[in-house]
């Protein structure tokens, strides 16, 4: 799978492993995750993903999809997932609700971006949405929450903890509208003053 090992000690550790316990079929054999729950800001609890979501959940999936670099290709053998498993999980859920990544990219073009890195634990894009420059930030809730100025953070924190306790990988999604795109996009000028829109949980 062209995996890169960050710490050399991991090679020795993996070599001595005799039993691996995995959460579900596909995580190890296919490097694939599945989106199972979403929470929208203003709701009291998360909802399960069924493949036919309401307007609020679809908006969250659409927004999160725009801030993804992965893709889902349909082949005679089935879906071919390209990219990070957390991103393709979002894209597959969006596709089940009629939102194809390529069509989203065409309708809401990406104008700028800050790629994900392990220090920030965030990814940010600027897309043209409904005639506005929409900044979309996705990443770990504990990092993103400190950059949010609007939204029900108390409930979001509780939901994040509940999802995490059920072994879900949780990503938060937040946005803001800007008048002009900075000549040099940085974390300081894009990843602050955000409105929390929701959480996505996958396994």
Model-identified regions with their sequence ranges:
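Conserved cytosolic headpiece of P-type ATPases
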Residues: 1-203
């Amino acid at each position: 799978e062209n995996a890169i090992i960050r710490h050399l000690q991991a090679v020795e550790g993996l070599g001595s492993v005799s039993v691996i316990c995995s959460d579900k079929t596909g995580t190890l054999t296919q490097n694939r995750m599945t989106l199972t729950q979403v929470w929208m800001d203003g709701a009291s609890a998360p909802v399960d993903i069924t493949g036919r979501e309401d307007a609020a959940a679809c908006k969250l999936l659409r927004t999160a999809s725009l801030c993804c670099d992965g893709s889902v290709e349909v082949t005679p053998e089935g879906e071919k997932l390209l990219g990070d498993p957390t991103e393709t999980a979002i894209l597959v859920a969006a596709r089940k609700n009629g939102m194809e990544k390529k069509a989203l990219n065409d309708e809401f073009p990406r104008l700028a971006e800050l790629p994900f890195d392990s220090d920030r634990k965030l990814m940010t894009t600027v897309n043209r949405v409904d005639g506005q420059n929409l900044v979309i930030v996705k990443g770990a809730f504990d990092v993103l929450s400190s950059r949010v100025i609007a939204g029900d953070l108390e409930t979001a924190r509780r939901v994040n903890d509940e999802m995490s306790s059920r072994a879900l990988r949780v990503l938060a999604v937040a946005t803001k509208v800007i008048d002009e795109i900075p000549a040099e996009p940085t974390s300081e000028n894009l990843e602050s003053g955000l409105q929390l829109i929701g959480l996505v949980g996958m396994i």
